[in-house]
Amino acid sequence: MTDTHSIAQPFEAEVSPANNRQLTVSYAGRYPDYSRIPAITLKGQWLEVAGFATGTAVDVKVMEGCIVLTAQPPAAEEGELMQSLRQVCKLSARKQKQVQEFIGVIAGKQKVA
């Protein structure tokens, strides 16, 4: 009789065969000596379906015989107040002081002279 630990467990493939793509490494010419360098081109609507919409940042991990592409989540949009603060930081010291005084007036901490 077979021991329970030696029974093969069925498993599902990590990637559906329908999601597999076949590519061929081509080349791109490099100016000025026109040397050929290896190139892989990925394009198709399936990229967006897979989470790689136009403009998506991509993390690339390279190993021997394996390249892993990972879509990076979009950065959280900065709030309007933080954008304004970054603009104020670029101003001269005199203008920064004026902004601070204005905020004090709006907050009711200072009186207008």
UniProtKB/Swiss-Prot annotation:
Q: Name one GO cellular component term.
A: cytoplasm
List the molecular function annotations (GO) for this entry.
Answer: DNA binding; RNA binding; RNA endonuclease activity
Q: Per the UniProt entry, what are the Gene Ontology biological process annotations, in alphabetical order?
A: RNA metabolic process
Known EC number = 3.1.-.-
Family under the similarity heading: Belongs to the SymE family.
Cross-referenced HAMAP family: Endoribonucl_SymE
Give the function comment from the record. Answer: Involved in the degradation and recycling of damaged RNA. It is itself a target for degradation by the ATP-dependent protease Lon.
What protein name is recorded for this chain?
Endoribonuclease SymE
**Gene symbol?**
symE
